[in-house]
């Protein structure tokens, strides 16, 4: 496969055809054009989740990572309440670079009233540039949930 996002046809054949719907609590599953999942957590509350990797960005990678994931969740009408970060750094990365990424992430989270609720950080020779994946968690009343499938700017 080529570098970049996997094509729609490959996603349909290799990913979505392999996934089965098992839980009635899952109201919306990710799919073509659907960036969020929605899970009924009771009392007319729905948890909205989305995850995005950031690759190839050298400047403000932490800022970009939070904004992209928060935007996905906000597009469903949900309030973003927290994020989990997975940061994989190439061998030789200096601690100051990691500190800057986390400062960017925390600055954006502060502006948006989002909490960093957890994550994972490691150095690996499997990557040659930083890879940040942010998973966002939001909440909304079930009756207010919007599907992002097919939305256009």
State where each predicted segment sits:
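Residues located in well-ordered beta-strands
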Residues: 37, 135, 139-141
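Extreme N-terminal cap/leader segments of soluble proteins
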Residues: 1-57, 76, 85, 103-117, ...
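A glycine-rich phosphate/pyrophosphate-binding beta-strand-loop-alpha-helix module
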Residues: 60-137
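Residue-level detector of solvent-exposed, low-hydrophobicity positions
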Residues: 18, 23, 62, 94, ...
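Acidic/histidine-enriched ion/cofactor-binding microenvironments in catalytic or ligand-binding pockets
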Residues: 139-153
């Amino acid at each position: 496969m080529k570098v970049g996002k996997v094509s729609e046809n490959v996603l349909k054949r290799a990913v979505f055809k392999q996934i089965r719907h098992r839980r009635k609590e899952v109201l919306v599953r990710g799919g073509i054009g659907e960036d969020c999942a929605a899970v009924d957590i009771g009392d007319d509350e729905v948890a909205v989740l989305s995850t995005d990797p950031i690759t190839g960005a050298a400047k403000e990678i932490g800022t970009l990572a939070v904004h992209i994931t928060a935007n996905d969740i906000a597009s469903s009408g949900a309030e973003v309440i927290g994020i989990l970060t997975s940061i994989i750094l190439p061998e030789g990365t200096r601690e100051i670079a990691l500190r800057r990424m986390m400062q960017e992430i925390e600055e954006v989270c502060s502006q948006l009233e989002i909490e960093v609720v957890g994550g994972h950080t490691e150095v690996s020779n499997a990557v040659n540039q930083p890879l940040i994946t942010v998973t966002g968690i939001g909440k909304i009343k079930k009756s207010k949930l919007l599907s992002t499938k097919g939305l256009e700017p």
